[in-house]
């Protein structure tokens, strides 16, 4: 039985771990991020991967920082055949990668060499890509730079957001890994070096990027909203109040009003201007301190004062 140390943290990694267990790989330990406080009540919560490991009585290691930790020494001493990672969230020291008797591999959520880094799914949606995918690569010291063993593609549509794509890619990644590992173990897998001229990066989304730019064309604005959904949500300042836009529909009609202005408003519909004289319909939003609302609920409640012609979204809260 091939022994594995598995590293992962979010829901994306859970089907991959479950797949390895189902295929009778010997999971010596699971390494995941420490429990974090979540939600308004700031309750301590285990990562999805930790929860999955505990269901199978697999030992769990949770170093705050892996490098130089007792958990690192413990993992190296296990001398696994394979190290498998999927969205773990920490840098892996070279001496740990070298502890694998066969190889250390990573399931990465993009079609490498495009989108190395921590937010490949968000950037693929944000940039309006027609497809994304997963890549099985060798783990090396340089981030996401190892040779590629396999790729699988996934079409993207306007119905997708980061949540839906995460779910689809986790299953695609599981299947691709389970198909590829036997070839890697047997030494028959083909290695393809990444083309350095085609490398792009997808750094972790910053707080500043959550502030939506109303001067973008409506199509690009929609892409940003979907890229930031469902976890954080993108926001604007609507009448000076921080308001999250959860769903919009770009429209074909244009408008000469300034970006952030209301083109049309009735009890059930709100049409606004984005950049380059494009327009969009607001479908779902969330005023500060309140729950998500349909546009009808908003217009018949907190948004009653809005009228056509007003410029209500501004770059700053003043």
UniProtKB/Swiss-Prot annotation:
Keyword Ribosomal protein attributed: no
A GO molecular function held by the record: methionyl-tRNA formyltransferase activity
Domain of life of the native organism: Bacteria
Pfam families: Formyl_trans_C, Formyl_trans_N
Binding site for (6S)-5,6,7,8-tetrahydrofolate: 110-113
Family annotation (InterPro entries): Fmt (IPR005794), Formyl_trans_C (IPR005793), Formyl_transf_N (IPR002376), Formyl_transf_N_sf (IPR036477), Formyl_transferase-like_C_sf (IPR011034), Met-tRNA-FMT_C (IPR044135), Met-tRNA-FMT_N (IPR041711)
One Gene Ontology CC term in the entry: cytosol
Known EC number: 2.1.2.9
UniProt keyword Transferase present: yes
Keyword terms of this UniProt record: Protein biosynthesis, Transferase
Enzymatic class: transferase
Reactions catalysed: L-methionyl-tRNA(fMet) + (6R)-10-formyltetrahydrofolate = N-formyl-L-methionyl-tRNA(fMet) + (6S)-5,6,7,8-tetrahydrofolate + H(+)
SUPFAM superfamilies the record matches: FMT C-terminal domain-like, Formyltransferase
Family classification: Belongs to the Fmt family.
Function: Attaches a formyl group to the free amino group of methionyl-tRNA(fMet). The formyl group appears to play a dual role in the initiator identity of N-formylmethionyl-tRNA by promoting its recognition by IF2 and preventing the misappropriation of this tRNA by the elongation apparatus.
Protein name, as recorded: Methionyl-tRNA formyltransferase
Gene designation per UniProt: fmt
């Amino acid at each position: 039985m091939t022994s594995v140390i598995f590293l992962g943290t979010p829901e994306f990694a859970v089907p991959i771990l479950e797949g390895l267990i189902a295929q009778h790989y010997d999971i010596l330990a699971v390494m995941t991020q420490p429990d974090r406080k979540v939600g308004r009540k700031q309750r301590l919560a285990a990562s999805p991967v930790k929860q999955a490991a505990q269901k199978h009585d697999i030992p769990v290691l949770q170093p705050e920082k892996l490098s130089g930790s007792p958990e690192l020494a413990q993992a190296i001493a296990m001398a696994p055949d394979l190290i498998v990672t999927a969205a773990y969230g920490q840098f892996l020291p070279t001496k740990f990668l070298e502890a694998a008797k066969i190889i250390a591999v990573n399931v990465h959520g993009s079609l490498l060499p495009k989108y190395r880094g921590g937010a490949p799914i968000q950037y693929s949606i944000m940039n309006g890509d027609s497809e994304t995918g997963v890549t099985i690569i060798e783990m090396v010291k340089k981030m996401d730079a190892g040779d590629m063993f396999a790729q699988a593609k996934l079409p993207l549509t306007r119905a997708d957001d980061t949540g839906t794509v995460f779910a689809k890619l986790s299953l695609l990644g599981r299947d691709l890994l389970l198909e590829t590992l036997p070839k890697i173990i047997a030494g028959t897998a083909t290695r393809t070096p990444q083309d350095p001229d085609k490398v792009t990066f997808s750094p972790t989304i910053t707080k500043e990027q959550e502030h939506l730019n109303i001067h973008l064309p409506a199509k690009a604005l929609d892409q940003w909203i979907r890229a930031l959904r469902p976890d954080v949500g993108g926001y604007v300042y609507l009448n000076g109040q921080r308001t999250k836009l959860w769903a919009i529909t770009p429209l074909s009609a244009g408008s000469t009003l300034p970006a952030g202005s209301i083109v049309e408003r009735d009890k059930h519909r709100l049409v606004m201007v984005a950049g380059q004289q494009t327009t969009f319909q607001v479908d779902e939003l969330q005023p500060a301190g309140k729950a998500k609302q349909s546009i009808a609920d908003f217009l018949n409640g907190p948004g009653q004062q809005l009228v056509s012609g007003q410029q209500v979204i501004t770059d700053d809260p003043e």
